């Protein structure tokens, strides 16, 4: 029997292959695949249901319908295998050959393949250099094309209409050759000399200067070279032979009632065959040209529809008016072959059921219903029953299991022991959505889930369902246990923090037991230890919250890792002493000696993991959960209406607000404020009132007054149930309590605008009808948003996974010295993210020095773990250069040092880890939590007043970076540079706060001066931009002509007059070319020079500038010459949330991007056009100046004569990532994208490690554009894989040749996924047709490097445990020792089979 199995295994042996190539099929190739020509459109005989001969299901071509049996029934049984029946011509073999044998149709006239014709850019059109319209007119028989001009004046490829053709025939006779239809195009393609054409084009490319022409030429050269190199022939894009798909892949299925369901392909094939046969007949009869032509056109259309229905003209529809599904539709889209059957398969040995809570389970267990387990583990049970001799055959075992005999359950118990199962909850947004557990058999029909893993699954018990999968092989079980067990996934891969964290009831229970209460029963006792505390509590002698003294023994690890005991008397409460009993050895008592909220518990588990490792943490987590549940039950915390205490002040606050609103309304009616101002003010008033009410309410809820032991009143934190739930972090928030007991506040309309009448009632008082109606607005919008958000978030995740799927850690250290400089994230006065959080788990790129000395604090290539980070903090280091995947030098993949710590495991990452997918999941998974549109938080709270000063919060010294300044007449500094930053440095040299200081700010304190906390250090006018003089002297007006360039305005109230510069649009013709400016001269009337340059101090005034000086006035440096009003309220709606993240990763250009300086130099303005200004930057070194046209309405940040550096902002706006990359480099764009993405997530309180975003940025930067080819084979302007250029340049430099120069490109994630080198991966993502067309023409090889390609071809992925297998395969192939597959011929096999069968018959049945 063993030999038989061996033989059957040998039959299904797959070939070892390393790459997949796609190319055009030549007619001969198609004929070589084919097993015969399909000549008739018939499918099966309606009476006998046997396939018709030569038809679409013909058994002679495609193989027998029944296993080992010919059609007429002459040969049956295995012994005739391989015989071809002389009566019906069918080979006797297995039916499954009908899935792999192809046929063909010999087309009577060539037809163009629609993909190469219509998939843009049209390959045929590009190759022939003809417009697509013309080619189509030829193909569909509307005009002629000249193939050979001969001695006539007709050009090759010239298009002739019917009339022109007839005229030419009369004139030239047979001198020339012109045809129509696909034959003509085929002839043109055949007669092309590709190499010759390439040469001509390359010469042309070197001569031409026009940009568009060069682009077109490079496109053609690339296509021609692709044809030359891949060995494809252009004429193969025209089909002369059409392959026919094997019949079992387009089946005809009999339905009941004698009807048949058929695949649409059969209809499409039938049309082609019918038209082809008709055309053959017409050609034999030598029918008139016009009839033949029409038939040929119809054949072309039929073939088009078969290949890609609907690509040209109207789609051919079936009987039910639905377009037929063509071959192209079979593979593309969500229901296509790639995404439906290759990337997502359904698997056997799985089941699904509803989940319920299993609070008594251990962390590694799940409850599995007996019924399910019995079904899932059937084969194992059969095996065991046979092994034990309880059943003689499988059949008997089956019967036993069906009868559910008692012994079966015992066997099931054994089988299930230590056999993990996988639990999965859809949607699986990250890898923690599938984890392994050991099953525990339970009664009932619902799966029981451990409460602590709910956070990872995002599961709740309101009817969620989960699927169970059984890992069958030993390897699978091993992987499930070692890698996927829930106990091995304590930390989240997104941020390295524990994800097995108690929530809700457990938190409430722990919080309740660790709270203290004034004057509780048993206060002041002194106890010998936690055990006694528990005893007293159980006996009812002391309350859980009583403040007592307890003797506590703590254990601390010494240098050798041994535990040292330390006993002391601690002030604590009974509850905390009881909780201490479950805390593992090695943690300090201070960790539980506090009221434990959710954050504190999370920190406790994190500390436990870092100090003690995995096993104690898992046990501790379980114990915490049991304890939490127990004490939550004892606490009796519940929600009652009396817990919602409405503050007394509420009424008066609301009436005050109403009075203010009435006042504003009066002002509006008397015309003092505009409608917009009134609306804004009203909303501000209500937002403030709302805050006051909620503050009063929280103060009221937070504390209660009690009598202490000495009979005095004392404030203590309240034991109000609702407050406790919110305070502990178990459920609810201040905002929700506000709606219950304060006031509901302002509501938003569905479009995001705020309704100005707030809801003053709360839910305890109840809403009236109007208020209820307003509320429904917001509620419905919430639901609609959620639905949209989920879909959008899923799509973002899909794009991210696709772009990063092939990124795997492939080596230990690439040795690069490059890296990213990490600094703490500081916004305004607060540190949003300290340095330690940013560098923890990264590897240093260079030695970190002790600040102010040359001592090495941390050497290069050190993985910064917690202890190193403590050291950095102690020495107040505020910038560390760390390795990053963006600057990693590995060719394919990245190295472990550039990535750093594996966040989910806590050590440096292993080789073979799929970091790309992890990054994509970490960014995509919280996507559903991000709001679609940033809801105005609490209405108008997000609308802050315009900033006009900087007030520091801490004491320290000021440091100004890239600041230029002058001292004004009152001795204060005035800033005259654009992007000045002010940092506050504490006494250890750490940056505490950081602010942007605008141009024209007056500084109260200078660089390096000490300030106290709360001091204002800079002031400016937020509504105008000043023009500041850098020199002292007298003002001289130039080109300031009243009525032409300026106009005088007088203020009615003050009587002061000022000059206003007219915008060029408002000027008269005479004033158009004048450029109003203020010149500073000395007493003799000579120009004053700007210090440090040889430029005269002349300040050109932009339009709308207001001048409050008169000609000839004396001024001193730092004075304001003019003010340019800024359009305030120009804050456009910032896209927030998910769409913003998508925009960043898609690298979309913002609508009105900031304009950056392309080169460093001096600014001047050239000649203006109607709507634009000409900005000229002249480099200091005297090289070519750079010009750029800028629309006049853009506000410029620079004045004439100012010096800018490359990449400085010339005009404000959102920065375009492409500009940042071009002008400031890779690190700057990485920093930009990382910070912007983090801002969105931070706003939602989601923590994601920077490296995940960096991984995606690396993938966005994986293409480069060749600027100068050097000695390489690249084309100028060609876009190639960055790693390819790197490898090519390395080889060239090794041989002493000149490498190619290039610039890095930033692609959006969709573009980057489609531009990947693997066509299989790109085709399975989007735009399948285009990708495959392109790949086929270029004859691309897919090296199967990524994960997706390997999943599609059905082998282990080159990551994780499959990494070793692939490495091994490569190594063996390099050594040339791939084992040859044992060749079993059919003859040997049949002989051994016959032998076996005979032996089986002859022998007895009991073996």
UniProtKB/Swiss-Prot annotation:
GO terms for molecular function: DNA binding; DNA-directed RNA polymerase activity; magnesium ion binding; zinc ion binding. InterPro entries: DNA-dir_RpoC_beta_prime (IPR045867), DNA-dir_RpoC_beta_prime_bact (IPR012754), RNA_pol_asu (IPR000722), RNA_pol_N (IPR006592), RNA_pol_Rpb1_1 (IPR007080), RNA_pol_Rpb1_3 (IPR007066), RNA_pol_Rpb1_3_sf (IPR042102), RNA_pol_Rpb1_4 (IPR007083). Binds 1 Mg(2+) ion per subunit. Keywords: DNA-directed RNA polymerase, Magnesium, Metal-binding, Nucleotidyltransferase, Transcription, Transferase, Zinc. It comes from the Bacteria. It is an enzyme of class 2 (transferase). GO terms for cellular component: DNA-directed RNA polymerase complex. Its cofactor is Mg(2+); Zn(2+). One of its GO terms (biological process) is DNA-templated transcription. Pfam families: RNA_pol_Rpb1_1, RNA_pol_Rpb1_2, RNA_pol_Rpb1_3, RNA_pol_Rpb1_4, RNA_pol_Rpb1_5. It catalyses: RNA(n) + a ribonucleoside 5'-triphosphate = RNA(n+1) + diphosphate. Its EC number is 2.7.7.6. Mg(2+) binds at residues 460, 462, 464. Zn(2+) 2 binds at residues 814, 888, 895, 898. Zn(2+) 1 binds at residues 70, 72, 85, 88. DNA-dependent RNA polymerase catalyzes the transcription of DNA into RNA using the four ribonucleoside triphosphates as substrates. HAMAP family: RNApol_bact_RpoC (MF_01322). The RNAP catalytic core consists of 2 alpha, 1 beta, 1 beta' and 1 omega subunit. When a sigma factor is associated with the core the holoenzyme is formed, which can initiate transcription. Belongs to the RNA polymerase beta' chain family. This is DNA-directed RNA polymerase subunit beta'.
């Amino acid at each position: 029997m063993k030999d038989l199995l061996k033989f059957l295994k040998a039959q299904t042996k797959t070939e070892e292959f390393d790459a997949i190539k796609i190319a055009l099929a030549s007619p001969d190739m198609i004929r070589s695949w084919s097993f015969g020509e399909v000549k008739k459109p018939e499918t099966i005989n309606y009476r006998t249901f046997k396939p018709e001969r030569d038809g679409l299901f013909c058994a002679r071509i495609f193989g027998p319908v029944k296993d080992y049996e010919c059609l007429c029934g002459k040969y049956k049984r295995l012994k005739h295998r391989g015989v071809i029946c002389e009566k019906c011509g069918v080979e006797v073999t297995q039916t499954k050959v009908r899935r792999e044998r192809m046929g063909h149709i010999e087309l009577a006239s060539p037809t163009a393949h629609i993909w190469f014709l219509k998939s843009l850019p049209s390959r045929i059109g590009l190759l022939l250099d003809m417009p697509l319209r013309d080619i189509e007119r030829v193909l569909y028989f509307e005009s002629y094309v000249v193939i050979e001009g001969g001695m006539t004046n007709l050009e090759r490829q010239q298009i002739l209409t019917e009339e022109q053709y007839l005229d030419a025939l009369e004139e030239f006779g047979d001198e020339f050759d012109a045809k129509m239809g696909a034959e003509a195009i085929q002839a043109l393609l055949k007669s092309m000399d590709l190499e010759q054409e390439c040469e001509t084009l390359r010469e042309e490319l070197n001569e031409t200067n026009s940009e568009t022409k060069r682009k077109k030429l490079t496109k053609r050269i690339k296509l021609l070279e692709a044809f030359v190199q891949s060995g494809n022939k252009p004429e193969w894009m025209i089909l002369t032979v059409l392959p026919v798909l094997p019949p079992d892949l387009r089946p005809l299925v009999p339905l009941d009632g004698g009807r048949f369901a058929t695949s649409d392909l059969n209809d499409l094939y039938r049309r082609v065959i019918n038209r082809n046969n008709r055309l053959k007949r017409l050609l034999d009869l030598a029918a008139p040209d016009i009839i033949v032509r029409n038939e040929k056109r119809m054949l072309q259309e039929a073939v088009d529809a078969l290949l890609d229905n609907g690509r040209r003209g109207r789609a051919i529809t079936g009987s039910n008016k639905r377009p037929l599904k063509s071959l192209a539709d079979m593979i593309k889209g969500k229901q296509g072959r790639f995404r439906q059957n290759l990337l997502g398969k359904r698997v056997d040995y799985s089941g699904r059921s509803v989940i319920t809570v299993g609070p008594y389970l251990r962390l590694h267990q799940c409850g599995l219903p007996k019924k399910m387990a019995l079904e899932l583990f059937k084969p194992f049970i059969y095996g065991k029953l046979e092994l034990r001799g309880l059943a003689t055959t499988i059949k008997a075992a089956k019967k036993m299991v069906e009868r559910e005999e008692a012994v079966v359950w015992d066997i099931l118990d054994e089988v299930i022991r230590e056999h993990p199962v996988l639990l999965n909850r859809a949607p699986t947004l990250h890898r923690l959505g599938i984890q392994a557990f050991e099953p525990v058999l339970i009664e009932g029909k619902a799966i029981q889930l451990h409460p602590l893993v709910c956070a990872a699954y995002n599961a709740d018990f309101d009817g969620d369902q989960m699927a169970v999968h059984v890992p069958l092989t030993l390897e699978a079980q091993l992987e499930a246990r070692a890698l996927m067990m829930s106990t091995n996934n304590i930390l989240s891969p997104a941020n390295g923090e524990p994800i097995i964290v108690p929530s809700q009831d457990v938190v409430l229970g722990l919080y309740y037991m660790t709270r203290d209460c004034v004057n509780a029963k048993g206060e002041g006792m002194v106890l010998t230890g936690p055990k006694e505390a528990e005893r007293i509590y159980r006996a009812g002698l002391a309350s859980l919250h009583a403040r007592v003294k307890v003797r506590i023994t703590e254990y601390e690890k010494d240098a050798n890792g041994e535990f040292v005991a330390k006993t002391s008397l601690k002030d604590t409460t009974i509850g905390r002493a009881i909780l201490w009993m479950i805390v593992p050895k090695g943690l300090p008592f201070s960790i539980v000696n506090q009221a434990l909220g959710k954050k504190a518990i999370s920190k406790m588990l994190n500390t436990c993991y870092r100090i003690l490792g995995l096993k104690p943490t898992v046990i501790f987590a379980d114990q915490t959960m049991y304890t939490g549940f127990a004490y939550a039950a004892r606490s009796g915390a519940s929600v009652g209406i009396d817990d919602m205490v409405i503050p007394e002040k509420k009424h008066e606050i609301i009436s005050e607000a109403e009075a203010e609103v009435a006042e504003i309304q009066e002002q509006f009616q008397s015309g003092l404020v505009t409608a917009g101002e009134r609306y804004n003010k009203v909303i501000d008033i209500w937002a403030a009132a709302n805050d006051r009410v909620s503050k009063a309410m929280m103060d009221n809820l937070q504390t209660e007054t009690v009598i202490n032991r000495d009979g005095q009143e004392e404030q203590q934190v309240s034991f109000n149930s609702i407050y406790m739930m919110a305070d502990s972090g178990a459920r609810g928030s201040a905002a929700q309590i506000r709606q219950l007991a304060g006031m509901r506040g302002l509501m938003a309309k569905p479009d995001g605008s705020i309704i100005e009448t707030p809801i003053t009632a709360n839910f305890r008082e109840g809403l009236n009808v109007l208020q209820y109606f307003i509320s429904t607005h917001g509620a419905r919008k919430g639901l609609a948003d959620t639905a949209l958000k989920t879909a959008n978030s899923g799509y973002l995740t899909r794009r991210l996974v696709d772009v990063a799927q092939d990124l795997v850690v492939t080596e230990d250290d690439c040795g690069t010295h490059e890296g990213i400089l990490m600094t703490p994230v500081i916004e305004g006065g607060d540190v949003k993210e300290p340095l330690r959080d940013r560098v923890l788990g990264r590897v240093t790129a260079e030695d970190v020095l002790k600040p102010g000395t040359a001592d090495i604090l941390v050497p290069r290539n050190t993985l910064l773990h917690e202890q190193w980070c403590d050291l950095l903090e102690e020495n107040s280091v505020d910038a560390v250069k760390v390795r990053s995947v963006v600057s990693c030098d590995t060719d394919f993949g990245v190295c472990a040092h550039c990535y750093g710590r594996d966040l989910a495991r806590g050590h440096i990452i292993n080789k073979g880890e799929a970091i790309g997918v992890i990054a994509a999941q970490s960014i995509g998974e919280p996507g559903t939590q991000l709001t679609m549109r940033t809801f105005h938080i609490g209405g108008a709270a997000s609308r802050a007043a315009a900033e006009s000063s900087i007030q520091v919060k801490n004491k320290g010294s000021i440091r100004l970076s890239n600041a230029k300044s002058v001292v004004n007449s009152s001795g204060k500094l005035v800033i005259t540079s654009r992007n000045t930053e002010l940092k506050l440095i504490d006494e250890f040299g750490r940056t505490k706060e950081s602010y942007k200081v605008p141009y024209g700010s007056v500084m109260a304190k200078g660089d390096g001066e000490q300030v106290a906390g709360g001091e204002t250090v800079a002031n400016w006018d937020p509504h105008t931009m000043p023009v500041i003089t850098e020199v002292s002297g007298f003002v001289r007006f130039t080109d300031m002509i009243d009525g032409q360039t300026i106009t005088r305005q007088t203020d009615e109230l003050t009587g002061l007059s000022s000059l206003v510069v007219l915008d060029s649009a408002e000027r008269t013709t005479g004033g158009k070319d004048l450029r109003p400016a203020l010149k500073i001269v000395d007493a003799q009337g000579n120009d004053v020079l700007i210090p440090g340059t040889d430029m005269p101090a002349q300040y050109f005034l932009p339009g709308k500038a207001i001048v409050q000086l008169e000609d000839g006035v004396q001024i001193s440096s730092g004075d304001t010459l003019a003010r340019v009003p800024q359009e305030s309220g120009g804050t456009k709606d910032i896209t927030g949330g998910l769409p913003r993240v998508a925009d960043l990763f898609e690298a979309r250009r913002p609508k009105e991007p900031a304009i950056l300086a392309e080169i460093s130099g001096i600014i001047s303005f050239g000649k203006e056009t109607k709507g634009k200004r000409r900005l000229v930057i002249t480099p200091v070194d005297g090289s070519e100046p750079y010009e750029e046209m800028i629309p006049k309405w853009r506000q410029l940040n620079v004045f004439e004569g100012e010096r800018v550096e490359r990449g400085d902002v010339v005009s404000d706006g959102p920065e375009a990532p492409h500009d940042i990359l071009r002008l400031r480099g890779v690190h700057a764009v990485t920093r930009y994208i990382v910070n912007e993405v983090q801002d969105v997530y931070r706003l939602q309180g989601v923590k994601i490690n920077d490296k995940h975003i960096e991984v995606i940025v690396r993938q966005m930067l994986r293409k480069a554009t060749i600027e100068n080819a050097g000695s390489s084979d690249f084309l100028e302007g060609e876009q190639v894989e960055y790693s390819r250029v790197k490898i090519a340049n390395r080889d060239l430099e090794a041989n002493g040749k000149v490498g190619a120069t290039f610039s890095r490109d930033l692609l959006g994630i969709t573009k980057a996924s489609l531009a990947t080198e693997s066509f299989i991966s790109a085709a399975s993502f989007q735009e399948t047709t285009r990708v495959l067309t392109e790949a086929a023409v270029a004859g691309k090889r897919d090296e199967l490097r990524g994960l997706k390609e390997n999943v599609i071809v059905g082998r282990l992925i080159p990551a994780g445990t499959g990494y070793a297998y692939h490495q091994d395969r490569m190594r063996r192939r390099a050594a040339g020792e791939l084992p040859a597959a044992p060749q079993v011929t059919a003859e040997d096999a049949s002989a051994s089979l016959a032998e076996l069968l005979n032996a089986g018959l002859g022998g007895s049945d009991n073996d």
